[in-house]
Regions:
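Catalytic, metal-anchored helix/loop core of enzyme active sites in primary metabolism
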Residues: 1-383
Length: 383
């Protein structure tokens, strides 16, 4: 029986993770649930899964739940609560699906405690990949990617010699604005950005998908997970989202992983590896499949991908700067304080003004993240 903590249990990945657990309750057991502020949904999850520990990051939400909850689950709040849940001896695996930078410290503490990681929080590797992967190697724990692209790469690389890899081919849907040019994007609305053509995701990641920043984050994540140079990681726009990623080898052979656009597939694979089990996701019907098309990404229009490559190649503290600026810019766009194209300008300005710290420690990254967020907010509110 695998005992699991789900950090971010009320979000998109978290709720789908719980659906996987429902279907394999003989193999997977929830011991820890954690959410930001959705106390009502968390309470429902507690009543269903009966974990040993539940955490609300928001203290007000915690107080509301504590006032009415009468069960046996221990309730905690705040970052210390998240760390308690991520390091308890009641679990062996942590699903990190907290949004953005907030997932970094609990993930690091979980690794230090020897927990295996099912990673949905790609920002953890973007911001502190060198430190995270080094600690994972020291503790000899596994980091299994939950997102579809890196789960696909993992399967395509499984059992192969990394020295024989020519390219990692990371697929992208192209988002809701595929084929559009800069002029077309000047006045796009939040609602338009949130209309993703193939995937159902949270609001922040859907905006990142529209800007191609999400794919940029995945490029950096791939570099960290598989220790390949950036010139060996290529993004391919594949609008149908049937092929989730591919690996091309030195002999010209390409191995691809295909599947339906259902996040329960990569979640289940990460949690049940090396076993394969029946999944509730719909199987592909090749008789009904028509076209599989591929395009080169337009990085002149969708600058998020180019900015991520630049930040990744510079390394050090630069990916942290890029990520912090992006998170604040996306939040401002969702609140209709800036335009969609302003997101790129804000990220680029933050990167250009930053003097890179080559080998930052974890606390350096927290300080840099805080400073960049403050600077970006000041710029936005002055506009």
């Amino acid at each position: 029986m695998k005992k699991i903590a789900v950090l971010g249990s009320t979000g998109s990945i978290g709720t789908q993770t719980l659906d996987v657990v429902r279907n394999h309750s003989d193999f997977l057991k929830i011991e820890v649930l954690a959410a930001n502020n959705n106390d009502e949904l968390l309470e429902q999850q507690i009543n269903e899964f009966k974990p040993a520990i539940a955490i609300l990051h928001n203290k007000e939400a915690y107080e509301k739940l504590k006032a009415r909850y009468v069960g046996e689950t221990k309730l905690y709040y705040g970052e210390e609560g998240l760390i308690e849940g991520a390091t308890t001896d009641k679990i062996d695996t942590v699903v990190t699906s907290l949004m953005g930078f907030a997932g970094l410290r609990p993930t690091m503490r979980a690794i230090e405690a020897g927990k295996n990681i099912a990673l949905a929080n790609k920002e953890t590797l973007v911001v502190a990949g060198d430190l995270v992967m080094k600690k994972a190697r020291e503790k000899q724990i596994g980091i299994m990617p939950i997102d579809s692209e890196h789960g696909a790469l993992f399967q395509c690389l499984h059992g192969e010699d990394m020295n024989k890899v020519d390219k990692l081919l990371v697929t992208a849907s192209g988002g809701p604005f595929r084929g559009k040019k800069i002029e077309d994007l000047k006045n796009v609305s939040v609602k338009q950005c949130l209309s993703h053509p193939t995937w159902k995701m949270g609001r922040k990641i859907t905006i990142d998908s529209a800007s191609l920043m999400n794919k940029g984050l995945e490029v950096i994540e791939a570099k960290q997970l598989y220790n390949v140079d950036y010139d060996k990681i290529q993004v391919v726009v594949h609008p149908q989202s049937i092929i989730h990623s591919m690996v091309q080898y030195v002999d010209g052979s390409v191995i691809a992983q295909l599947g339906s656009t259902d996040m329960r597939l990569p979640i289940q694979y990460a949690l049940t590896y090396p076993e394969r089990m029946v999944c509730p996701a719909e199987n592909l019907d090749f008789w009904q499949m028509k076209d599989l098309t591929f395009e080169k990404p337009d990085t002149d229009t969708f600058r998020g991908l180019a900015l991520a490559y630049e930040a990744g190649k510079i390394g050090g503290s630069m990916p942290c700067v890029m990520n912090a600026a992006n998170e604040i810019a996306v939040e401002a766009f969702l609140n209709e304080q800036i335009s969609f194209l302003d997101i790129y300008d804000i990220i680029e300005e933050a990167m250009q003004s930053h003097i890179t710290l080559v080998e930052p420690e974890l606390e350096d990254l927290f300080e840099i993240d805080s400073n960049i967020r403050k600077q970006v907010k000041e710029k936005i509110y002055k506009c």
